[in-house]
Amino acid sequence: MAAVGRVGSFGSSPPGLASTYASGPLANELASGSGGPAAGDDEDGQNLWSRILREVSTRSRSKLPTGKNVLLLGEDGAGKTSLIRRIQGIEEYKKGRGLEYLYLNVHDEDRDDQTRCNVWILDGDLYHKGLLKFSLDALSLRDTLVMLVVDMSKPWTALDSLQKWASVVREHVDKLKIPPEEMKEMEQKLIRDFQEYVEPGEDFPASPQRRATAAQEDRDDSVVLPLGADTLTHNLGLPVLVVCTKCDAISVLEKEHDYRDEHFDFIQSHIRKFCLQYGAALIYTSVKENKNIDLVYKYIVQKLYGFPYKIPAVVVEKDAVFIPAGWDNDKKIGILHENFQTLKIEDNFEDIITKPPVRKFVHEKEIMAEDDQVFLMKLQSLLAKQPPTAAGRPVDASPRVPGGSPRTPNRSVSSNVASVSPIPAGSKKIDPNMKAGATSEGVLANFFNSLLSKKTGSPGGPGVGGSPGGGAAGASTSLPPSAKKSGQKPVLSDVHAELDRITRKPASVSPTTPPSPTEGEAS
């Protein structure tokens, strides 16, 4: 009891202890001196200091504990660091190497107390698994929560990743050589927490003292149900949380890889079976869409610090699933199997959820533009090597009339006949009325030409060449006037005869066939 006396002496007591009880429930007794040596009652003084020690220990127990740890395991690129940084509220960060250390600030508003939760992130390469000895040892084993992170943008790796990292934890725990009695106690605690899970209600107490009392009463009154055949068959003695990240990629899997709802139900059923074997919880998250990030933090502090949470299980939304440890069982997982249409329950995960074929990305060769002068010199050399006939189309030197059609000389007709290709059998037939129309046009042309020639040959009329008395034929001026007058009568008779013939046969010209100017000029 001498030690108690030394602690009770304010001269030698720590300043924190004196300041703690300056306004405590025993302040009046200390101020009145009823517990001091001047009272002369040693027994009452010893009882007083015993009460002080008990209250100090009670207050120390009511504060938030320190030394709690979260260990994150998963493949490279699964989003482990991104998840913790988002919980911390940090946008920009740098990924560590090997074993990364972070922390979470934990604040209890009811107790007005805060502490830090240690976060260890192991590299995705198995080469670094030896670093687990710095984050998970025999002393910190009881205060550690294991978080297995799965990348849902690559669901074909989900099951293998979970089994691989769970085996890494099991191997490391076995190397710690924990006494069997202590390990058995940790396993039994995990089983008890799984069996005593209760759906969160609205009347859940908020005060820490009331929480502890209510939890103890629930444990005393509740009936513990036996575990299922596949439940906690791989008990690590540690609370486990499975976090599926990048769940926003579910829509991409539907569009690009033809995933359907039954595929996602199939994936979820296998992950939930794994969680049953290890007694783990399951949360689907998305850092990109900030989905269920706060839920991960709330579940961590609930498991490590006993904070309450009022969030029930969510299984309806395929990209925001939340299944706390102790809620799930084989019957609830069987509900997912009812939606299977083309899949079967006994199908292997690797046979259904396969890795899509890798599309080879062909890198196009970067082309550097040449100098303009070098390019023009190469082009000039290429043009110089080509023969002149191949440089372009031969120019048509035949003369053209104002209408646009070339006039072919008569002398070249015979030479060009051999070069004309034969007319195909399916070409358009020649209109038989075209010849008759061309003949009548020729007659009309001859008729009007004769009129012009006769008119120019009349006395006093201008000649063709512009000289008076000049006709189409030079001999017309030498004829006597009597001969000219006698020649006019046959011309008039020819005009009347021609007009009568045209009037009697108007249908000889085809109305649909346009006159050929080439033939008229030739006649």
From Swiss-Prot:
Give the sites modified to Phosphothreonine: 213, 408, 512-513
Q: Which residues form a coiled coil?
A: none
Give the region (Disordered) as residue ranges: 1-45, 387-434, 457-523
Output the Gene3D superfamilies linked to this UniProt entry. Answer: P-loop containing nucleotide triphosphate hydrolases
Q: Which biological process, per GO, is one annotated for this protein?
A: regulation of centrosome cycle
Annotated positions of the Phosphoserine modification: 207, 398, 405, 412, 419, 421, 427, 486, 510, 516
Listed SUPFAM superfamilies: P-loop containing nucleoside triphosphate hydrolases (SSF52540)
Q: What is its main location?
A: cytoplasm
Ranges annotated as biased composition (Gly residues): 458-473
Q: Where is the composition biased (Low complexity)?
A: 412-421, 474-483
Q: Where can this protein be found?
A: Cytoplasm; Chromosome, Centromere, Kinetochore; Cytoplasm, Cytoskeleton, Spindle pole; Recycling endosome membrane
Its PTM note reads:
Phosphorylated during mitosis but not in interphase.
Q: Name one GO molecular function term.
A: molecular adaptor activity
Query: Keyword S-adenosyl-L-methionine: yes or no?
Result: no
GO cellular component terms, alphabetically, are: centrosome; cytoplasmic dynein complex; endocytic vesicle membrane; kinetochore; late endosome; microtubule; recycling endosome membrane; spindle pole
Task: Give the intrachain disulfide bonds.
Answer: none
Assembly behavior:
Homodimer. The cytoplasmic dynein 1 complex consists of two catalytic heavy chains (HCs) and a number of non-catalytic subunits presented by intermediate chains (ICs), light intermediate chains (LICs) and light chains (LCs); the composition seems to vary in respect to the IC, LIC and LC composition. The heavy chain homodimer serves as a scaffold for the probable homodimeric assembly of the respective non-catalytic subunits. The ICs and LICs bind directly to the HC dimer and the LCs assemble on the IC dimer. Self-associates.
Q: What does this protein do?
A: Acts as one of several non-catalytic accessory components of the cytoplasmic dynein 1 complex that are thought to be involved in linking dynein to cargos and to adapter proteins that regulate dynein function. Cytoplasmic dynein 1 acts as a motor for the intracellular retrograde motility of vesicles and organelles along microtubules. May play a role in binding dynein to membranous organelles or chromosomes. Probably involved in the microtubule-dependent transport of pericentrin. Is required for progress through the spindle assembly checkpoint.
**Protein family according to the UniProt entry:** Belongs to the dynein light intermediate chain family.
Q: What is this protein called?
A: Cytoplasmic dynein 1 light intermediate chain 1
Query: Which gene is annotated as encoding this protein in its UniProt record?
Result: Dync1li1
